Amino acid sequence: MAKHYFQVDVPTWSAAQPERQGRHIFTGSADDGRQAVRLARRVCEATLAARAAGEPLPRRSPDGWGARGVRPGWELDWTAATVVPWRHNSLL
């Protein structure tokens, strides 16, 4: 199966101030939406673990997944994650 580029949107909120809410967007290539969520979560967890250990944050993987912008102290609701094919907007 050919890989496609996906956008995974994950609801997030501040653990210290739950009224502060948002979404964290991950993008990268995967075979399907289920794999996209799995890969996004894996890079997110690796980034949080590196940050907690005081190690350098992982760089973006060759397939596009990265999570350097994940905020410490913010919770992510992976059960509410949504996946859509990523559409590049060249105006951004």
Please provide the spans of the model-predicted regions.
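A short, charged, amphipathic alpha-helix used as a generic interaction element across diverse proteins
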Residues: 31-54
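Short aromatic-glycine-(Arg/Gly/Cys) micro-motifs in beta-strand/loop hairpins
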Residues: 1-23
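A structural signal for the main folded, soluble domain(s) of proteins
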Residues: 10, 18, 27, 76-84
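Short, mixed-charge low-complexity intrinsically disordered segments
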Residues: 46-92
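A short, exposed loop/beta-hairpin motif centered on an aromatic-Gly-Thr core
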Residues: 20-33
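Residue-level marker of intrinsically disordered, low-complexity segments enriched
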Residues: 6-8, 23, 35, 41, ...
